Amino acid sequence: MKDLLPDLCDLYPEKLQIAEPIFTSYGKRSHFYGEVVTVSCFEDNSRVRELVAENGKGKVMVIDGGGSKRRALLGDMLAEKAVDNGWEGFVINGAIRDIAAQSQLNIGIHALCAHPMPTEKRGLGDLGKTLRFAGMTIAQGDYIYCDLNGIVVSKQPLALP
């Protein structure tokens, strides 16, 4: 496994936002990247459920759950659907669950923590909004790169080393 982020930081220091080191890698793929699709939701993963059913090839779903550690925004069933629909991964400012199952899925997942409680399903949340967390501002259509070194965001796609 190659360390992608140190190389990107060497090559493009002026083009990157670097996330505060608050995330843990949970998916089988610790190294992933793609075009950002944003979701803003607090303890309700209804919009996440909608998006994983869509084609996610080349895309990473970035979910701002307000940093809540009381409800899991992603479980194994939604993660499996995301794999089936080609999503590259998830970056979640919140919790996930079903850690053992998700660790076996061929997808990248960075989240704050694990928590066994599911979300409420109230149909709440927003798609496509600009998000602010972990010291970054992330817009729909930005590009995100993740590995075990952390997370970086760029306004345009970067040539990989």
From Swiss-Prot:
Annotated binding of a divalent metal cation, by residue: D98
Keyword Metal-binding carried by entry: yes
Cofactor: a divalent metal cation
EC number: 4.1.3.17, 4.1.1.112
Keyword Metal-binding among record annotations: yes
Enzyme class, UniProt record, top EC level: lyase
GO biological process: regulation of RNA metabolic process
Ligand binding (substrate): G75, D76, M77, L78, R97
Cofactor note: Divalent metal cation.
Reaction(s) catalysed by this chain's protein: 4-hydroxy-4-methyl-2-oxoglutarate = 2 pyruvate; oxaloacetate + H(+) = pyruvate + CO2
Function: Catalyzes the aldol cleavage of 4-hydroxy-4-methyl-2-oxoglutarate (HMG) into 2 molecules of pyruvate. Also contains a secondary oxaloacetate (OAA) decarboxylase activity due to the common pyruvate enolate transition state formed following C-C bond cleavage in the retro-aldol and decarboxylation reactions.
Family: Belongs to the class II aldolase/RraA-like family.
Protein name: Putative 4-hydroxy-4-methyl-2-oxoglutarate aldolase
Organism field: Marinomonas sp. (strain MWYL1)
